[in-house]
Design a protein with these regions (language model features):
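Glycine-rich phosphate/diphosphate-binding loop of Rossmann-like nucleotide-binding domains
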Residues: 2-27, 93-184, 188
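Adenosine-phosphate binding glycine-rich loop
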Residues: 82, 86-87, 106-108, 210, ...
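Short, structured coil segments at secondary-structure junctions
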Residues: 27, 78-79, 137, 202, ...
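Short, ordered loop/turn segments at secondary-structure junctions
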Residues: 36-37, 62-65, 86-89, 146-148, ...
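Glycine/serine-rich phosphate-binding loop and adjoining beta1-alpha1 elements at the start
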Residues: 1-113
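Rossmann-like adenosine-cofactor binding region
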Residues: 162-238
Length: 259
């Protein structure tokens, strides 16, 4: 549950009902919320497999990494309907679209920029993957988790984090942000400070997408940089970068073409 963590199936029901409302409101998709009171990936896979034949598609919601990767990949193999984890792919698609637009405004080339991704959960990894597919070299993306920079040789990295490890001497966000062109935050409130923003490259792009409160507010950025493009995940600030502007329509398309 956003901002609260794993509180069980009943507590998550209002969130899932809200998701159903968004599917209907934005893409005219009739959906049924199903909450599974189990956090074992194999049990979740088995449950969805057994009910999947009665649905046109499955939208996975709020499953933590790395379980979400395991569950989605397995369900894609065994079901013949769309299986979509919007926390990963919806976020990645709309963030990459925002990045392309911001780079066009700033006249920067995607294969030359330096990106810092603060957060290493499902959405952060999906964004980094799509950035790479869109032309950002892997060596130009620094990913940071609770421990610090994900670098080659760091111990206790799982296979998903290891895929984003790079050769670097930077160990903290404060180190990595120096001369960065882009900051993508999918982490926690206050993670990016005004002093860090000052260290970024000319015409920086800042996507502070932590919910419910961003890593830094637009007002704080504007206090120290007049050349920054700033977006958040909130609808009450300009430039919203939130998977709501993507996932309903992606799922609508998948259903319409019977993918």
């Amino acid at each position: 549950i956003l901002g609260l963590g794993n509180l069980g199936s009943l507590a998550s029901k209002p969130v899932m009902e809200g998701k159903s409302v968004l599917f209907k409101r934005f893409a005219d998709i009739d959906s049924i919320d199903i909450e599974i009171n189990n956090d074992n990936p194999n049990s979740i896979i088995e449950t969805i497999k057994n009910i999947g034949g009665t649905f046109g598609g499955i939208n996975l919601e709020d499953i933590a990494a790395p379980d979400c990767f395991i569950i989605e990949e397995k369900l894609k193999q065994i079901l013949d309907i769309p299986v979509f984890h919007d926390d990963q792919h919806g976020t990645a698609i709309i963030t990459t679209a925002a990045l392309i637009n911001a780079l066009d405004i700033n006249k920067k080339k995607i294969d030359k920029i330096k990106i810092v991704v603060n957060g290493a959960g499902a959405s952060a990894m999906a964004c980094a993957n799509l950035f790479k597919k869109s032309g950002v070299p892997q060596k130009n993306i620094t990913m940071i988790d609770r421990t610090g920079v994900i670098f080659r040789g760091r111990e206790n990295l799982n296979q998903w984090k290891s895929a984003h490890a790079i050769e670097t001497k930077n160990r903290t966000l404060d180190d990595a942000i120096k001369n960065a062109d882009v900051f993508l935050g999918l982490s926690v409130k206050g993670a990016l400070t005004k002093n860090m923003v000052k260290k970024m490259a000319k015409n920086p792009i800042i996507f502070a997408c932590a919910n419910p409160d961003p890593e830094i507010t637009p007002e704080e950025v504007e206090e120290v940089r007049s050349d920054a493009i700033i977006a958040t995940g909130r609808s009450d600030y300009p430039n919203q970068v939130n998977n709501l502007i993507g996932f309903p329509y992606i799922f609508r398309g998948a259903l319409d073409v019977r993918s």
